[in-house]
Amino acid sequence: MLTPPRTVVRRDGGLYALERALQRRGFRHVAGADEAGRGACAGPLVAAAAVLPEGRRGEIDGLADSKLLTPASRERVYAEVVARALAYAVVVIPAAEVDLRGLHVCNLAAMRRALASLATAPEYVLTDGFGVDGLDVPGLAVWKGDRVAACVAAASVLAKVTRDRIMVELDTTFPGYGFAEHKGYITAEHSAALRERGPCPEHRFSYVNVATVSGRRGAPPRARRPLVVGLDEPMERSGAVEGTVGVALGERPWAAVSVGNDVAMEGGM
């Protein structure tokens, strides 16, 4: 295994500086991983990983942290990442799985599965914010990594666009909550709809605001969801909504499945 680099890279060196430094040290395939939906109280948690080509082939015009891009810009950059990445993978974790296993456990498992699903095996991994254990290659957790590493920014766009598309679908299936607008995050409109309608199956009952309106605030976090499936039972059997990982490739959407038995959307050059 190659020795991790000791090169000092300035945070203001540009979006590609960190990957270029790693590649100069011999790590040709640098993967970035990020997620979308941690702070939402409804909808899935989505993790993505991406490996961009070396040099100018890996430079994508307008690439940035997905949160800094307009919806139209995200869609354009998403298409560029899908077309030009050496490899990419997206994993979708349903809200019920987040309730059963816990947010951080699902976050780590989803990022780990996305990285393991890459068609091009990474030689070094960059993650946004916190490290991911259980990898066979060296890695680095980078604070605000989606703003300083191109591969992490690419992963953030993949995760964000995939999740936003799912929330638009859920808005049709569960009208009245405004999912297409706020994407499952807490807003005044969302809170008012929760109080008026109560939660739907796509809400995260382990979150205090959802548990409160459902009348289950006093129950332990993992016991708040009314219908609990077994940990080893695929989530498609629990009535989870279809419309997750395959849609971005123009394929028929697949049902969301559990961390232990998930299906990743894979692709690349």
Swiss-Prot record:
A divalent metal cation binds at residues 34-35, 128. Its EC number is 3.1.26.4. Its cofactor is Mn(2+); Mg(2+). It comes from the Bacteria. Its main location: cytoplasm. GO terms for biological process: DNA replication, removal of RNA primer; mismatch repair. GO terms for molecular function: manganese ion binding; RNA binding; RNA-DNA hybrid ribonuclease activity. Keywords: Cytoplasm, Endonuclease, Hydrolase, Manganese, Metal-binding, Nuclease. GO terms for cellular component: cytoplasm; ribonuclease H2 complex. It catalyses: Endonucleolytic cleavage to 5'-phosphomonoester. It is an enzyme of class 3 (hydrolase). Residues 28-222 form the RNase H type-2 domain. Belongs to the RNase HII family. Endonuclease that specifically degrades the RNA of RNA-DNA hybrids. This is Ribonuclease HII. It comes from Salinispora arenicola (strain CNS-205).
